[in-house]
Swiss-Prot record:
Glycosylated. Its EC number is 3.4.23.-. A motif (PAL) lies at residues 492-494. Residues 1-27 form the signal peptide. Ubiquitous. Residues 28-196, 270-278, 341-345, 392-429, 484-488 are lumenal. GO terms for biological process: proteolysis. This is Signal peptide peptidase-like 2. Residues 95-173 form the PA domain. The chain crosses the membrane at residues 197-217, 249-269, 279-299, 320-340, 346-366, 371-391, 430-450, 463-483, 489-509. Intramembrane-cleaving aspartic protease (I-CLiP) that cleaves type II membrane signal peptides in the hydrophobic plane of the membrane. The gene is SPPL2. Glycans are attached at N83, N176. The active site is at D385, D438.
Length: 540
């Protein structure tokens, strides 16, 4: 097996892996719903994340994040409207019986357990507390709900649950100082963040670059093919075989592609852990190195053509150009540095560079041969996205796609198979993210459109590429609108992108009477150079 074929197989394997995660989500939803905890009078709050800012002796100290209860007074959203109130521990600590300490508008801290949450809140309110902080007995947060048989739900103080480590920190503060105060508020996310604009431009730019590279290569191959025909060469190299470095998928492989992605998604969901994410990081680094190397070699070969055309035989890999040997160490070091520092705030830059390079390279290698295959692939992916974001909740009691995207149970901030940008003006921080498949799958169809336009000598207006790009941009824009309307809950991007992109291509093709040739052949009819030469000879 030569190095080129090995590279292609490696990249295809990576692309299958990456396609298993596609939902566009934001890290850390601040508003949560729970169908297992239905609302009723006096117990109808949304589960919102709450910031608990502390002060010691008037000096600002640690900030904790908790979750508001289904019952009680709603928590203010603006920091300026939140009062800075004295903190005390309840006596008894569980607040399951009337409190012995009399409070005057203090925020009381209680421990979870021994009685219902509403009983703790009623006892705290009766003692004069202005708010209730319940410390969980685990590191995770827990949604505080009302029991089905509860009727006394007229609770007029807010209740917030904090994780176990926050409780330990608060206990240490109160042990060292008697002047500890806190401020409770739940700021809202902005309707639109600049990060979403940049992410939109990043997705558009990635498909644009990949499409032009793919179309340029296809046109060069077509010109070379015609030249060989004109020279009357008996054996014309087949540009569709493995020697060209291009892999064309068919309808069967498109369906199998999505089935395999579903299987891998379930494996991710079931085996998600720290060590499994480490394995994904290694796989991502391998694919990222190959992608970055391919892009850099293609770019630099215009200035260093001699180094790009001179090869040396490397054991186990076969012939490799000097330019590839020069670029490879940089790519490897870049990926290793990202892997080492990936938990730092600046690591998203390296992740996006590796991800974009990998997507562009896969779009250069994998081709959709016609509109029929593109329709099958995107239709299957459309159903796949809807199933694993929405329908999977019925089977697994949570959205499998979103759980995998967030990297739950992994101890890390999501898996690396996505592009992300920090939310710049969001008080909660986090990232706006988009799965590789939301770029890669529509990109296959859009790149096909540009290849057809160039081979058919169509202009931007009379071609299909520009309209497919506009449709993709609108579909992705609608995705972000839906994301914000749903309070940041994960949205299957292909639910909006596929109808826009595929619908535009099919409608235009039918209107222009190109549907049959796009659906079956995928390239325009071209005159045979031999026929042209024979006609010229007969005229003499």
């Amino acid at each position: 097996m030569d190095s080129l074929r090995f590279l292609r197989i490696l990249l295809l394997s990576s692309s299958i892996l990456l396609l298993s995660l596609r939902s566009t989500v934001t890290a850390g939803d601040i508003v949560h719903q729970d169908n297992l905890a239905p609302k009723k009078p006096g117990c109808e709050n949304d589960f919102v994340l709450v910031k608990v800012q502390t002060w010691i002796d008037g000096v600002e100290n640690e900030e904790f994040v908790g979750v508001g209860a289904r019952f009680g007074k709603r928590i203010v959203s603006k920091e300026k409207n939140a009062n800075q109130t004295h903190l005390v521990f309840a006596n008894p600590r569980d607040s399951c019986t009337p409190l012995k300490n009399k409070l005057s508008g203090d925020v009381v801290i209680v421990e979870r357990g021994n009685c219902r949450f509403t009983a703790k809140a009623n006892n705290a309110e009766a003692a004069g507390a202005s708010a209730l902080l319940i410390i969980n007995n685990q590191k995770e947060l827990y949604k505080m709900v009302c029991e089905p048989d509860e009727t006394d739900l007229d609770i007029q103080i807010p209740a917030v649950m904090l994780p176990q480590d926050a409780g330990a920190s608060l206990q240490k503060m109160l042990a060292n100082s008697s002047k500890v105060s806190a401020q409770l508020y739940s700021p809202r996310r902005p309707a639109v963040d600049v990060a979403e604009v940049f992410l939109w431009l990043m997705a558009i730019g990635t498909i644009l670059c990949a499409s032009y590279w793919s179309a340029w290569s296809a046109r060069e191959a077509a010109i070379e093919h015609d030249k060989l025909l004109k020279d009357a060469i008996d054996e014309i190299p087949n540009t569709n075989d493995g020697g060209s470095g291009v892999v064309e998928i068919n309808s069967i492989s498109a369906i199998f592609f999505v089935v395999l992605a579903s299987g891998f998604l379930v494996i991710l969901y079931k085996l998600m852990s720290y060590w499994f994410v480490e394995l994904l990081v290694v796989v991502f680094c391998i694919g990222g190195v190959e992608g970055l190397q391919t892009c850099l070699v293609a770019l630099l070969s215009r200035w260093f053509q001699r180094a790009a055309d001179t090869y040396v035989k490397v054991p186990f890999l076969g012939p490799i150009s000097y330019l590839t040997l020069a670029v490879s160490p940089f790519c490897i070091v870049f990926a290793v540095l990202w892997a080492v520092y990936r938990v730092h705030s600046f690591a998203w830059i390296g992740q996006d560079v590796l991800g974009i390079a990998l997507i562009i390279t896969v779009l250069q290698i994998v081709h959709v041969p016609n509109l029929k295959v593109g329709t099958v692939l995107l239709s299957c992916a459309f159903l796949y996205d809807i199933f694993w974001v929405f329908v999977s909740k019925k089977l697994f009691h949570e959205s499998v796609m979103i759980v995998v995207a967030r990297g739950d149970k992994s101890g890390e901030d999501g898996i690396p198979m996505l592009l992300k940008i920090p939310r710049m003006f969001d008080p909660w921080g986090g990232y706006s993210i988009i799965g590789f498949g939301d770029i890669l799958l529509p990109g296959l169809l859009i790149a096909f459109a540009l290849r057809y336009d160039w081979l058919a000598n169509k202009t931007l207006r009379t071609g299909y590429f520009i309209w497919a790009m506009v449709a993709y941009g609108l579909g992705l824009l609608i995705t972000y609108v839906a994301l914000n309307l749903m309070d940041g809950h994960g949205q299957p991007a292909l639910l909006y992108i596929v109808p826009f992109t595929l619908g535009t291509m099919l409608t235009l093709a039918r209107k222009r009477d190109d549907l049959w040739i796009l659906w079956t052949k995928g390239e325009p009819e071209r005159a045979c150079p031999h026929h042209v030469r024979l006609e010229q000879c007969s005229e003499k």
